[in-house]
Amino acid sequence: MKFLKKYLLDILVVIAFAIISFVYFMPADMDGRILFRHDAAAGKGLGHEKELFQQQTGETTRWTNSVFGGMPTYQMSPSYESNQVLSQIVKAYHLWLPDYVWYVFVYLLGFYIMLRAFNFRQSLAALGSIIWAFSSYFFIIIAAGHIWKVWALAYLPPMIAGVVLAYRGKYLKGLLLTAIFSAFEVQANHVQMTYYYLFIILFMVIAFLADAIKKGELARFGKATAVCVVGALIGISLNLSNLYHTWQYGQETMRGKSELVKKNAANQTSSGLDRDYITQWSYGIDETWTLMIPDAKGGASVPLAQNQQAMEKADPNFVQIYQQLGQYWGNQPGTSGPVYVGAFVCMLFILGLFIVKGPMKWALLAATILSILLAWGRNFMPFTNFFLDYVPMYAKFRTVASILVIAEFTIPLLAMMALKKIVDEPEILTEKIKYVYASFGLTAGFCLLFAIMPGVFFPDFVSVQETLALQQLPQEYISPIMSNLTDIRKGIFTSDCWRSFWIILIGSALLMLFKMKKLGKEYMIAGIAVLCLVDMWMVNKRYLYDDMFVDKAQRDTPQQMTETDKIICRDKELDYRVLNLASNTFNENETSYYHKSIGGYHPAKLRRYQEMIDAHIAPEMQKTMKAVAEAGGDMTKVNGDSIFPVLNMLNTKYFILPLQGGQTVPVQNPYAYGNAWFVDEVQYVNNANEEIDGVGKVNLRHVAVADAKFKEQLAQSVKQDDTSVVKMIQYKPNNLTYEVKSSKGGVIVFSEIYYPGWTATVDDQPVELGRVDYILRAINVKPGNHKVVLDFHPQSLKNTEMVAYIGYGVLVLLIIIGIGVEIKKRKKTAEAAKE
């Protein structure tokens, strides 16, 4: 009963969070409809082979051959036995609520836990949770299907709560919270978001250090730091399998450093990613106003003609053109929506800079500024280059605009610290009233100026790319269209400027009513909560709304087979590849649903495969399209050995070609080398550049090109004859069996992608795999008949799983200790009360 009485308000807040989350998704959640996410729908094919194999065998394969010729599945819905227990704990944490509903619920609950750790009263903590959770970006990523990112962001505030508790001297609670939520965080599997929030934690720890130095409590600071480190290590240990294999995989992907020495070395970073690639999605400098004015740059990249209110100003003669132009006019290539943290929240943040005292304020301000400067990316390259070159791991992540998640955390937190100061010390509104006016002027004042004189502060409402595109129109149309388009977009902009102005004015009025004692503090908090919730709810409904939800059957329906798919699937050969030339080959996974594709889509494909795409595969695709078209599909008239040798070595047995009317046709490639073949010779080279160049200079059917470091494994081959045969007799994605017959022996090249962790046996005896032709596996066998098996069951899985289970044991022990300490504490309190 005492427990219920103590935590009743907290329980009511949690129930309110669940209700708010349900209501946002009504009526879709009541109808059982689900979000049609393009990313999820397009990704069906990516993991289809993995899912089928698991259904048929009960085994989880760590390799699939369905995309990019073959790649690990570590970043395709990663699943490890040790994570099953953690997954059940996670489900309990979000109260087994349905999808989408629980995403918003854990946003709310996580920030609430953190604010309670900061010693906020329940009502203020609930308000703070609303303004953080309803930040627009968090709903935009739900709509886009970036669910791992959703989870990662939701678990970071409660993880920080553990850090806060530890530095407040509550070591055991801090340890448990840090351990549990760092485990949740790592399992969420979005390293980029976790990495960005480490900057927040770093600044906060510096603030705690400054406070400890001031108070002479360095020993306490050291103890708290140790507690946080131990908690983080426990959380990491529970996810060691995922972490280790993600790290290992990362070394081999586009996020790892390339062995190629490129001519344009200045554009390269230590991670191997190009600077242009990393900064492609950079927030515009003037786009930063979206933090306070959501449509400062028009919102999302949707057709302008969809905005009915804006189109009231459109010239009817140009409506067709506006179907082609986006509502967004910023300098990003495109966007699903802006980063909006709330207009009145921005005012409270500015006010917090004046009235909140202590090092934590400066830590939050520094993190906010850092976040904004880094989000500018290519628009502020000196600063960006410094981080790319000197800050560990920063160059491994693209879409730098997403680092604004830091500002989306720090702005609401400092805003809530300001409101807490006002609630705890009401007299501050009288003593520091000039700061309230200043904060109002710096926020509502700018909104008013922008609304009245938009052209003075923002001269361009048409992007550079749009201006260039419009130059293709007849000269007499360009000026009227530009003028009308500018008027339309000014209307979009000024509408939201007025909107933000009124929201800040209403919020400020609530503060003034509290100052004049015409409104109690709880009523003021409730009023601000309603104001901010309505404000941000309405903005979020622009990007995540009911019409985006469909019947579950519509999304979960298996991908329909085309006639082309049916024809290719009649081929009963165990393993071959398909190249879809009728699609955006390297930006789709539909082909992978039924076939082993040369193409695919994954943000972290193997680096060497990408380099082969750039150097050989893409050029061969163009030549293939041209040659097959000129031959009218008659492959006997195509010189396949010289036109597409790399596609042949990848055992590309079928090309899918486009026809008129959106139809396709399969064309069989008679030049494909098959699953494996003996070569006459191995040419050894000294580096990656020589290796990738050498692939284009030899007859790959007879000669293999290998780095000299594989000379010990592969040695040399011998000239072969027609009696040398390699035949695949069993196929599993993670286990391939071949029957080999050869009177001479030598080097066998497999049309399979080389990756560390694959092992080979010949007649059940282990042999070392080598890498040839830049991306393929190879072994050397002796003369005779042999059974060769290639297998992918990395030993590292067993080792990391064992460590994870040890971590579980430590966590359970800590929980038992925590319960014991709490019981002992209550007994002492009860005994003291009796005395």
What kind of region is each of these model predictions?
Residues 54, 59, 65-69, 76-79, ...:
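Extracytoplasmic/lumenal acceptor-recognition loop(s) of multi-pass membrane glycoenzymes
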Residues 10-46, 231-245, 370-374, 446-451, ...:
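Transmembrane signal-anchor helices characteristic of membrane glycosylation enzymes that use polyprenol
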Residues 223-283:
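Polar, glycine-rich mid-to-C-terminal structural blocks
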Residues 129, 145-156, 166-183, 191-193, ...:
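Contiguous transmembrane helix-bundle modules in multi-pass membrane proteins
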